[in-house]
Amino acid sequence: VLARLPDECIDCVVTSPPYYMKRQYLGGGIGLEATYQEYIDNLLAIIKEVHRVLKTLGSFWLNIGDSYKNKQLLNIPHRVAIRMQDEQNWILRNTVVWDKMKGAMSQSKDSLGCEYEPMFHFVKKKTGYYYNSDAVRKKPRSARVANGAVVSATGVSGVRYRRKIELSTELTEEQRISAYKALDDVLERIKKGELSDFRMVIKGANQRVTNGNTSNLSGRAKELQDKGFYFLFYNPNGSMISDVWQIVPEDTQGRKLHFAPFPEDLVKTPIILTCPPGGIV
């Protein structure tokens, strides 16, 4: 079917191919190859066609489980992902951990039971691909005024940061005055509803610096070194969901048409995130 489709006609692809040596489907097919290398080669041939039919700003979500052979976990999902990057120019944006929250009873006496699978998000272009992050954000709590003080969505009132500014032995007097003013400005923005939450990192206050303390590696560290402080502002539309999704698998009991069905919720989030309205999945 893929071979008959024109180039760049699909907005979003979500798929989960047959896993290696897990099930025998009617007519054979992929997943029953003699070696895992042959299995991966066959997958990549199909994925190459996916790359062709996917639009430049489209997304490809690939859910694939792992397999054991000769007592060895084959690490198939990541072998596939790395070859996609190295050989087909796919750009990997996320590895989602699908936490199934339950699993089949493990009979192994020398390895752990597995209750997760990876789901990779690939794109063809580093920037500009369709991504509706606001559609899946966690709804933020609201800021408020308590006892005459502005309190952020997570309870930050400014009192603690004023104390840290006051006690810092590494701030110059000019930096200290600037820090007080900047904090007041941020609290005023919270009061007006322009921001919902923030964090303030102050030099000499024994706080962890974002991305490390070395200025040549972290822009935040350089800002801390130059100004004596910096702010982290939370998105007013809420925080982004994480890359761990807790979704219970579909119940397979009594099924006749397919014994490895996709949970609807596992498909729903990728489509909401990366398929534009009226797009083709």
Question: Can you annotate each of these PLM segments?
Answer:
Residues 1-281:
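Core catalytic lobe of class I
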